[in-house]
């Protein structure tokens, strides 16, 4: 039995299939951990969502910002839904949309396997959160998403504020938790997220740190695997294993085997990108735009590679 974590799919169905073939995925005995952002940008979001849904008995999914955006779109009126990009529109108009979206809404913000020694999230954790605290806060939002009032949560999750504070209540608290789990890259030592900084470490504004390198952060008792930050490439440092290697931007799609003493990395080439990368959008209201986010992903060979002794950090695609 093998356990594989897989980076952001972002609607790249054909590439996902190639990666599953390359790792010789056997649903009878293997398990897949998907790091979130199953959909958007890749042009095959419906096919990708159907594929992961079909593997639901053999996989674990954590929600990314694009997955939450899809859920919010699905909860809107038909008139509003028709204004979204064609890739996501195909999902909300599909005959099996209810089955797909209801299943997606039941997925986690954080997955923990203490026997295996791993936690999976999409983006990041607050500097002072232990893994136990992260689980607790994830469950708070998951219960809302899975309950009858989920539409109100999806309407109220947008925005950059407030920053995390243990005393937050209501939708402010839920929004802060969602932002940490699904949008985090850089933050201050107090855990304030910087949403405008998306490049490689060293390009951020003064006073900001990658969330996994913040001074004074707590020691965590589990290894962490995550996606979201494609500009990093394959990065393994401080007990964090970032595996979004920019498949949708022309990089690679990465699988990381979690159940071996020596971590094994398998990659396949990502989507061919011939024109400018589309504008990246976080889960905000449609009128708000974010800056461009591009990456070549990991520049290493697209095969089975050992984890580098020194973290490999890639630069964004120009």
Curated annotation (Swiss-Prot):
InterPro entries in the cross-refs: ApaH, Calcineurin-like_PHP_ApaH, Metallo-depent_PP-like, Ser/Thr-sp_prot-phosphatase
Annotated Basic residues bias: 282-297
Name of one Pfam family that matches: Metallophos
Keyword terms, alphabetized: Hydrolase
Region named Disordered: 269-318
Catalytic activity reported: P(1),P(4)-bis(5'-adenosyl) tetraphosphate + H2O = 2 ADP + 2 H(+)
Family annotation (Gene3D superfamilies): 3.60.21.10
A GO term for molecular function: bis(5'-nucleosyl)-tetraphosphatase (symmetrical) activity
EC number(s) from the headed UniProt entry: 3.6.1.41
HAMAP family xrefs: ApaH (MF_00199)
Family designation: Belongs to the Ap4A hydrolase family.
Chain's role: Hydrolyzes diadenosine 5',5'''-P1,P4-tetraphosphate to yield ADP.
UniProt name for this protein: Bis(5'-nucleosyl)-tetraphosphatase, symmetrical
Organism encoding this protein: Xanthomonas oryzae pv. oryzae (strain KACC10331 / KXO85)
Gene: apaH
